[in-house]
Amino acid sequence: MDKFTTLEGVAAPLKIINVDTDMIIPKQFLKTIKRTGLGKGLFSEQRYKDDGSENPDFILNKPAYRNAKILVAGDNFGCGSSREHAPWALLDFGIRCVISTSFGDIFYNNCFKNGVLPIRVTQADLDKLFDDAERGANATITIDLGKQEIRGPDGGTVKFDIDPFRKHCLMNGLDDIGLTLEKKASIDSYEDKAKTERAWA
């Protein structure tokens, strides 16, 4: 998992509440267990028309937001069924941070495990970030995880809270496997000791 320390980029404003995981990544894309290639399925029912052509009205199809790294979204983002493919799709598209007032619990947890930072802010702060995001490619936003702040294009800042352990994992690029490998020396020592003291086992 790539480390997350600071992120600077264009933020796409998605002013829709209750975006569920089926909208983020529809069920037909869940057949794979690969984490790559899912970006094409991100919001596919909104990004594409029935004939397969792009919907020019959807935010991520607009020229200013095609390379967005941050998503500013309406309340209760990521609600609905459990599917780890949702953060995989966001990440594969290039989005590493989602900002909203609230998230579906399972989606929220899955984001941290896959290198995507979900940030909760107040409605007032979200409205300000929507305004910043609507300025497009001329107004980048910076996420500073170390300082736990969002810096807008005009220098204004929004502070956010994050669990210290999750912050540690993101800043050091540690997923579940990485966390286990951090304890490799202790695990090896335990196993060597067990072989000596419990040779019969």
Swiss-Prot record:
* UniProt keyword terms in alphabetical order: Amino-acid biosynthesis, Branched-chain amino acid biosynthesis, Leucine biosynthesis, Lyase
From its record, what is one biological process in GO terms?
A: L-leucine biosynthetic process
Gene3D superfamilies annotated for this entry? Aconitase, domain 4
List, alphabetically, the CDD domains matched: IPMI_Swivel (cd01577)
Its gene is: leuD
Q: Which domain of life is it from?
A: Bacteria
Q: Reaction(s) catalyzed by this protein?
A: (2R,3S)-3-isopropylmalate = (2S)-2-isopropylmalate
Family annotation (Pfam families): Aconitase_C
| EC numbers for this chain | 4.2.1.33
- The protein depicted here goes by the name 3-isopropylmalate dehydratase small subunit
Q: How does it assemble?
A: Heterodimer of LeuC and LeuD.
Q: Which family does it belong to?
A: Belongs to the LeuD family. LeuD type 1 subfamily.
Q: What does this protein do?
A: Catalyzes the isomerization between 2-isopropylmalate and 3-isopropylmalate, via the formation of 2-isopropylmaleate.
